[in-house]
């Protein structure tokens, strides 16, 4: 999907890790939400409250889910899921343009 139609977008940016991750929240008519943003190159750890589906629009990264030892590489057009009440490590090697869907 190239765009979201009939949504609301929160104007205030979500800024994390001293500006290394910046996103905006998108609210859908059915009550679900997502964030649309960028993560700049570097290594970060994110904690999750609810399950997440991460779609990579462009860029490159490696991800290691909590409790796993292996890293998996992701690039444009790929996605990965993260369980709720968990965390994941991400190493961004090329600025990441992403959509994170909260389930």
From Swiss-Prot:
What Gene Ontology molecular-function terms does this entry list? guanosine phosphorylase activity; purine-nucleoside phosphorylase activity; thymidine phosphorylase activity; uridine phosphorylase activity
- Which CDD domains does its entry note? cupin_PpnP-like
Keywords on this record? Answer: Glycosyltransferase, Transferase
EC number(s) stated in the UniProt entry for this protein: 2.4.2.1, 2.4.2.2
User: Per its UniProt record, what Gene3D superfamilies does this chain match?
Assistant: Jelly Rolls
* Enzyme class name: transferase
Q: Which reaction does it catalyse?
A: a purine D-ribonucleoside + phosphate = a purine nucleobase + alpha-D-ribose 1-phosphate; adenosine + phosphate = alpha-D-ribose 1-phosphate + adenine; cytidine + phosphate = cytosine + alpha-D-ribose 1-phosphate; guanosine + phosphate = alpha-D-ribose 1-phosphate + guanine
- Mind telling me which GO cellular component terms the entry cites? cytosol
Q: Highest taxon of the source?
A: Bacteria
What exactly does this protein do? Catalyzes the phosphorolysis of diverse nucleosides, yielding D-ribose 1-phosphate and the respective free bases. Can use uridine, adenosine, guanosine, cytidine, thymidine, inosine and xanthosine as substrates. Also catalyzes the reverse reactions.
Family to which the UniProt record says this protein belongs: Belongs to the nucleoside phosphorylase PpnP family.
- Protein name, per record: Pyrimidine/purine nucleoside phosphorylase
Question: What organism is this sequence from?
Answer: Methylobacillus flagellatus (strain ATCC 51484 / DSM 6875 / VKM B-1610 / KT)
> Encoded by which gene?
ppnP
């Amino acid at each position: 999907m190239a765009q979201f139609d009939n949504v609301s977008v929160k104007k205030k940016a979500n800024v994390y890790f001293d500006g290394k991750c910046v996103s905006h929240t998108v609210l859908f008519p059915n009550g679900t939400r997502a964030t649309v943003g960028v993560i700049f190159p570097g290594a970060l750890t994110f904690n999750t409250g609810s399950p997440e589906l991460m779609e990579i629009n462009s860029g490159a990264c490696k991800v290691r889910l909590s409790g796993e030892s292996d890293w998996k590489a992701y690039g444009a057009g790929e996605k990965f899921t993260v369980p709720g009440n968990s965390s994941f490590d991400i190493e961004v090697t090329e600025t990441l343009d992403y959509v994170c869907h909260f389930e």
